[in-house]
Amino acid sequence: MKKILSLKKVNLLGPILLALLIAIPLYPKFPFQNVENTYVAIRIEDFLVAACLFVWGLYQLKNGFPVLKLKITKIFLLYWAAGLISVLSAIFISDIINPKLALFHFVRRIEYMSLFFVAYDAMKKLKLREVALAISFTSLLIFLYAMGQRYYSFPVVSTMNEEFSKGQLLILDKWTRISSTFAGHYDLAVWSTLVLSITPIFLVILKRKWERVVILLTMAINFYLLIMTASRVSFVAYLIGITLALLLLKKYLWLPLVLVISIAFGFSSAQLSVRLKTAIDPISSKIASIESWQKIVLFTEQSKDKYFKKPTPTPTTEPDISVIPSQVASDDTTPSIQPGKTTPTPKEGKIIYKDGKGSAWPSPEEAKLAAERSSSIRFDVEWPRAVSAFKRNPLVGSGYSFLGLATDNDYLRSLGEVGILGTLTFLLIHLHLLLTSAKNYLSRNNKNSVISAGLIAGLVSFLANAIFIDVFEASKVAFYFWMIMGILYYYLQTGKTHEKKV
């Protein structure tokens, strides 16, 4: 045991963190072990994280668990305690969820968030330059794979439905929004938004010209990836994040130029522009409509028997894809699916064939219908179901796993699953991060102000995405978010960046 504990001298946490920053986004979501009653699976990345936590635990044991001295640790523990209370209540009092499934999702929440502390301790020896270059290297590989996916039929491993989540290799046609190494285009969009929101601070901290060029290329790559995903929510979240970053960094002259270029490129993308234009009216009318809120109330009253006995996940919008024949078992009664032989069907923001020649964008009526469908799924099904779960037990909610895999609003999901108690403690974590950042930003330490700008911009853009996307449950982006927060929080607590004076 003494030999194992002596690993402190080797400082394995730094290399492990860099490995996680690179491996988690890049390794496709192949399932290692399926879990009964859900298509969330145990994957290779879970073993990598488990090994990382084991090494981190040895360091903590050797030093008397210094992590417990951090104020934010107590808030994390409060949230996990609230989640456990919610799960126990749903299992033993309400008896409305599968115990194994609920505990599985509870442990996964802890797994995602635990990397905050691993990243915090790993930065005691790492330089911010090394983190920035790891993110840049990862972005480049994700971009290259995305190009291969779009132009050379590189496969994607999707988790958009139960069949795809079994690890099938799928081929996207050239009109489908790309996913690269992620499980869906929304995940890729959220990840790119997070990276774009924090990378401006690297331009300020790093002083070598070649490093700044690398960071600028990283931003360009991730912006292009964001445009290719055609995610309206993430595009708006990016505009919020980059605006905050530039304002807090006092780059006032850069802000109008960056916003003009971003919006111009956003609307120059036919797919994204159609989705942006057609989203405004349906969403605003849904929000303003009394009928929509009456539907939520009616749904709440009528959903007890339908939703509280055996909850099932609500399917999210699926990409239009072709399955590689070798990956699919077929029989005489099922026609084989050949790549490139599929007949495209009109989908949300999708190009369709006309007369077999060229391609054309959907008509305004088709695009409007697609946008209305997307908002209706949230307003008429997923969100009312979350409200119903919350009303059943407002204090502690209905337990993890109760709402299935899709709510498309992490705040309503939190209220439905862990109630007021869990939601308040969860938001308290983010409030602590924001207040700590604000306090450091207002200090006279220029380094702390720069780091604070990145943390605030990254956090706010991520929280903006959470309004319409379940970002805290998507493993790749959740892992990355908590690692980034841990990295930046370390610098705010210690004032060390291991870089030259800013």
Show the residue positions of the predicted features.
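Aromatic-anchored transmembrane helix interface
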Residues: 44-50, 78, 96-121, 134
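A conserved mid-to-late transmembrane alpha helix and its immediate loop/hinge
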Residues: 179, 184, 382-384, 393-437, ...
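Helix-loop-helix junctions and helix-breaking kinks within/between transmembrane helices
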Residues: 41-44, 183-189, 214-246, 250, ...
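Membrane-interface micro-motifs in multi-pass membrane enzymes
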Residues: 40-44, 105-109, 179-195, 415-419, ...
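Membrane-interface catalytic loops of GT-C/OST-like multi-pass glycosylation enzymes that act
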Residues: 35, 101, 182, 229-237, ...
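Transmembrane signal-anchor hairpin modules in multi-pass inner-membrane enzymes, especially those
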Residues: 1-91, 129, 133, 158, ...
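Alpha-helical transmembrane segments of multi-pass inner-membrane proteins
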Residues: 53, 81-88, 110, 114, ...
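Transmembrane alpha-helices of multi-pass inner-membrane enzymes
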Residues: 53, 253-257, 454-465, 471-502
